[in-house]
Amino acid sequence: MEQEKRVFSIDVAGRPLVIETGELAKQANGAALVRYGDTVVLSTATASREAKDVDFFPLTVNYEERLYAVGKIPGGFIKREGRPSEKAILASRLIDRPIRPLFAEGFRNEVQVVSMVMSVDQDCSPEVAALIGSSVALTISDIPFEGPIAGVIVGRIDGQFVINPTVEQMEKSDMHLIVAGTKDAINMVEAGADEVPEEVMLEAIMFGHEEVKRLIAFQEEIAAQVGKEKMEVVLYEPDPELEAEIRQLAEADIKKAVQVPEKLARDAAIEDVKAGVIAKYEAEEADEEKLKQVQEILHKLVKEEVRRLITVEKIRPDGRKVDEIRPLSSAVGILPRTHGSGLFTRGQTQVLSVCTLGALGDVQILDGLDLEESKRFMHHYNFPPFSVGETGPMRGPGRREIGHGALGERALEPVVPSEREFPYTIRLVSEVLESNGSTSQASICASTLAMMDAGVPIKAPVAGIAMGLVKNEDHYTILTDIQGIEDHLGDMDFKVAGTRKGVTALQMDIKIKGLTRDILEEALQQARKGRLEILDHMMQTLSEPRKELSKYAPKILIMHINPDKIREVIGPSGKQINKIIDETGVKIDIEQDGTIFISSVDEEANQKAKQIIEDIVREVEVGQVYLGKVKRIEKFGAFVELFNGKDGLVHISELAEERIGKVEDIVSIGDEILVKVTEIDKQGRVNLSRKAVLREQRGAGELPKETREKRGRRPERHRMKP
């Protein structure tokens, strides 16, 4: 049946949000063109007709940036978009997280959601448009999606919450909060904040959810008019008789295995139970399909037992109380040649973070859809396979590593000193050495210690903690400092980072359909208690940033020049500035206001470069005496270089007190002589006098400090006769 174009509109934060269906991408299961202000995003949803032979839900979410959306042509030889940018990867994760919980357990059809950003209005977030567009595409399609969902950005200006703030408003806001959810509950939170109290964050989340409800009602109206009938799918379920058989066979052993306190020993005990059961069925020559069901049933039994222990008996796999943090240890300065290092260990999770300081020219250059062009504070997170005792390929960072790195960066950025206070580029690298849950939060703690060890004057130390949730019907248990098995088998991973004063970052992922205000409030308060405990421990290791930088860190010298002189320092095609860099070995960064940052590990090199720049921008002053070098000789006088690039003429009559016949009788090229500036004419030409200096010094009883072979007349030169 031919689809007709339909247009739906609603006002969001004073700007029209328009949804168009039925015209573009009609072969997808569902498609929606979202116009928010001048931002345009095409979102599509497509699903396979048959279930895939996998033991998970194969959902893929892609957020595709197109540089034509902001009128740019990609750089490089190829001149087309390549791998996704870091921001595109984070946006893909942002859309994936609220959508994924809203598919039925056992649904194994492959689903792909693609959002293409086609036009960007910086005041209207393309990520929000893509999130809403993805929900609309799924909701109006025949894919069995249990939505819709919606999301908004919440800012706070002068104590007032603002929905989807503009770029100008965002600069004044002390938080950047993204809230997504269904009409009944919140199922995704992502935030960066400037030490905002927990109770304010909670109110902001609930404020955002009210707008989410309005947007969901809008989507329900669209679905009622253009939505397709949902396809019938067969949800995967293991054989009930086989499940009862395996439960009888393995349940008692699984109950013992999951309560082994140490991670590796517990994993081994669980695997031994599973291996024994699988061996029994292999001996009976069970087919591949049956063995696959055996694996899934065993996993289900482990999950049920862990959840039962936590919710009913209030017992965690490692024996801790629900609000108890694992044993902590930390150290700083363990890598002697780095600028700063911090090691943070929490139970069997261990992260080593290293801080490197660089010149302002070391900033990361961004080529994306945002107005931002560079980044001077970076946090990178690496997760090698040995951290979980496994082998594996050592590739570049994946979506998870990029997401965890960005979360740490967002948590630490509010306490990083400004460029004026600390004119360095700062790069943090967090190496996960052991993993048993909460590595992203351990990286925040280790990075705080590394910056303090490096002497970065942070405003306050930051710590992070991951909260968990296990919910059965109306009963729930919130867990502090979740470990791997609790994250894997629980319902929530709620990461909270901040200082003693307040929250700097939040990230909430859940596997159930949503959370209520009460659960969020309890989780935030329990997280604060844990965060303060971790901060107390960290302060015992290093209570404040070191007063001095590492001797291996670059030293930065700041000077100011007249902005009109910048072109003289740079020179044609950068010739002058490159010459200074080659001569001294320093790095030089120049700002438009005339501020110059000179950086080098060698302080003497900084001073040398500064002197050269001062000479370049120095102005010749009438009446001043200079020690200059003779550069050129003419019949009428000598041209003398006063300092770098500045010269003047000493007329023959001004070279000596007595009358002379030739310039060469007094000076030669390369001589250093004292001269006085007598005049700068209308054309900018500088007139000099050596005679005036001689008179002044003779009157004072001093000899001129000149580098010459003789003073006064030179002997006549002998020439060979022809």
Swiss-Prot record:
Its cofactor is Mg(2+). Its EC number is 2.7.7.8. InterPro entries: ExoRNase_PH_dom1, ExoRNase_PH_dom2, ExoRNase_PH_dom2_sf, KH_dom, KH_dom_type_1, KH_dom_type_1_sf, NA-bd_OB-fold, PNPase. The keyword DNA repair does not apply. Residues 623-691 form the S1 motif domain. It catalyses: RNA(n+1) + phosphate = RNA(n) + a ribonucleoside 5'-diphosphate. Pfam families: KH_1 (PF00013), PNPase (PF03726), RNase_PH (PF01138), RNase_PH_C (PF03725), S1 (PF00575). Involved in mRNA degradation. Catalyzes the phosphorolysis of single-stranded polyribonucleotides processively in the 3'- to 5'-direction. The gene is pnp. Residues 697-709 have a biased composition (Basic and acidic residues). Mg(2+) binds at residues 487, 493. GO terms for biological process: mRNA catabolic process; RNA processing. It is found in: Cytoplasm. It comes from Geobacillus thermodenitrificans (strain NG80-2). It comes from the Bacteria. HAMAP family: PNPase. The keyword RNA-binding applies. GO terms for molecular function: 3'-5'-RNA exonuclease activity; magnesium ion binding; polyribonucleotide nucleotidyltransferase activity; RNA binding. This is Polyribonucleotide nucleotidyltransferase. Residues 697-722 are annotated as: Disordered. Residues 554-613 form the KH domain. Its main location: cytoplasm.
